[in-house]
UniProtKB/Swiss-Prot annotation:
The lineage of its organism: Bacteria, Pseudomonadati, Pseudomonadota, Gammaproteobacteria, Enterobacterales. Keywords: ATP-binding, Glutathione biosynthesis, Ligase, Nucleotide-binding. One of its GO terms (cellular component) is cytosol. Gene3D superfamilies: 3.30.590.20. This is Glutamate--cysteine ligase. Pathway: Sulfur metabolism; glutathione biosynthesis; glutathione from L-cysteine and L-glutamate: step 1/2. PANTHER family: GLUTAMATE--CYSTEINE LIGASE. Pfam families: Glu_cys_ligase.
Length: 521
């Protein structure tokens, strides 16, 4: 059943200011391609952008071809979107012959074997980041690792948690913030499938993308692509950005200590599969950081992550254990192909509303069996979410209801939260977002996945992609800087390059010593 939040809404209506300073941040990945939609395999242009190791706002993900744009956190949605646009414009204007691939699923037609792993210089820190990516390549292959997405970082203000504690937990030793975020995460797994339903934008792939992958999907063929007629986000499926560690670690998100222990178990538990890959190659060079279930905590691919800022050389598990959960990272957003920066304001506003709802709605602790039961609902949405009258389970007793009924029920709840947030800014932005998106459940042709699939059916993946990335290149070029200036970005480029050199000079350990000290405990 969908939890009732009426009493919590009344409480929020009496205390609206506790939502005043929500902090948000965005991370957007984008592949560099040429005019033909072929991935560019040249080295990351450090001389034009800055150091991928130390730049505050622009870096690389898995490969030299896969850019990552990072905004600082801010309480203003407009600020982070303008900031994101500024960094896109800077790179766009500096890489004259290059384009940002506008989809999550990478173009696969050429040169997959020659994709270059990201390089971060000669420091131990830089080398271990490259080694981690080498391990990912051996474990999961190149294609999975160059899938692009958008991550949304979200945290509620401290004053919210202070008020929340007064009505929930009298025990001063109780970590209200961490427990509140864990409640959010459990509800996110129960109901967060609305995100790929509304915003999923990877309904089709190229045949090469699934080559040598075992699956039971009955793909249809058209225009050189494979697609599922009702799918929303193949990126989130078992063909995309996933691994099997989540099943072996028995995650439930019932307590912080339980989650930290699961992370540490993944880091320390040997994997027969990864041991068979070997730790070293024939020349004695490392192939991966270790042969355990996880090389680092970042390898645990989930739809949402509890996060805490890291101190120098600190692991995520240590940071969470020592200081609790500071924010959550939403990882279920595909690249939005209908905007030049991969994400738009409506998506941010919907996520704000839904994540607040996930905190307000009661979320009892769950078993590992229940957790995987919820994942099955995600799988249904991901692979056939737009199918007419499609039903999903609403509890483990096989009670079902339609996606439309459940989705609209949640959106009606979000209207109440929208009214409160809009009252803080004297506009109707959140309410308008709800009014627009609730229609998607009755009219799935409005969803991103169906709109994109219709374009693919007419023009194919490459022509659709080219039409979009050429348009966005011109749009970004014509845009003016709003938050950052060109001078700011040039200064950060030079500063980051100098910072990388300084880190390289300060190393005192050789690489094996460094690896043993920080990664083989």
């Amino acid at each position: 059943m969908i939890p009732k939040i009426y009493k919590k809404i009344k409480w929020l209506q009496s205390n609206p200011l506790i939502l005043k300073k929500i902090l948000r941040g965005i991370e957007r990945e984008a592949l560099r391609t040429d005019i033909h939609g072929t991935i560019i395999n040249t080295a990351y242009p450090q001389d034009k952008i800055g150091s991928a190791l130390t730049h505050k706002w622009i870096t690389t993900d898995f490969s030299e071809s896969l850019l990552e744009f990072i905004t600082p956190t801010n309480a203003s949605t407009n600020y982070i979107l303008k900031f994101l646009n500024d960094t896109h414009k800077f790179v766009n204007d500096n890489l004259i012959q290059e384009y940002f691939w506008p989809f999550s699923i990478p173009p696969c037609k050429k040169y997959m074997h020659s994709i270059k792993l990201s390089k971060y210089g000669t420091s131990n820190l830089g080398q271990v980041k490259t080694l981690y990516r080498k391990g990912l390549k051996h474990r999961y292959g190149i294609l999975m690792n160059i899938i692009s997405g958008v991550h949304y970082n979200f945290s509620l203000p401290r004053i919210f948690w202070n008020h929340w504690k007064k009505i929930h937990h009298k025990n001063t030793q109780y970590n209200t913030t961490s427990e509140g975020y864990l409640c959010l995460i459990r509800n996110y797994y129960k109901f967060g499938w609305i995100i790929p339903y509304l915003f999923g934008a990877s309904p089709a792939v190229e045949p090469l993308f699934i080559k040598n992958k075992k699956h039971n999907y009955k793909f249809k063929k058209h225009h050189g692509m494979l697609y599922l007629p009702w799918s929303t986000s193949l990126r989130l499926s078992d063909l995309g950005h996933t691994n099997q560690s989540i099943k072996k670690l028995k995650l439930t998100f019932n307590s912080l200590s339980e989650y930290v222990l699961a992370l540490e178990h993944g880091i320390k538990t040997p994997s027969k599969q990864f041991k068979n890959l070997g730790l070293y190659d024939q020349f004695g060079n490392f192939k991966q950081i270790n042969t355990n279930l996880l090389q680092t905590e970042n390898e645990l691919y989930t739809y949402i992550r509890p996060k805490q800022k890291l101190k120098n050389c600190e692991s995520l598990s240590a940071a969470l254990r020592n200081r609790g959960i500071e924010y959550v990272e939403i990882r279920a957003l595909d690249i939005n192909p209908f905007t030049s920066t991969g994400v738009d304001k409506n998506q941010i506003l919907l996520l704000d509303l839904f994540l607040i709802w996930c905190v307000l709605a009661d979320s009892p602790k769950i078993s590992s069996q229940e957790f995987h039961f919820f994942l099955k609902n995600w799988h249904t949405i991901i692979t056939k979410g737009r199918k007419p009258k499609q039903k999903i389970n609403i509890n483990i007793y096989n009670t079902k209801n339609t996606i439309q009924t459940i989705g609209k029920t949640i959106l009606y709840d979000l209207f109440y939260i929208a009214e409160i947030l809009d009252s803080l800014s004297n506009n109707n932005n959140y309410q308008e977002t709800c009014k627009n998106l609730i229609l998607y459940f009755d009219y799935p042709e409005l969803t991103y996945s169906e709109k994109l699939l219709n374009k693919f059916m007419c023009y194919g993946i490459y022509e659709t992609g080219a039409n979009l990335f050429v348009k966005y290149k011109q749009k970004l070029h014509n845009d003016s800087f709003k938050i950052l200036s060109k001078k700011d970005l040039n200064n950060e480029m030079m500063k980051s390059n100098n910072s990388q050199k300084l880190i390289e000079k300060q190393d005192t350990l050789n690489f094996k010593e460094y690896l043993n000290l920080y990664y083989t405990k």
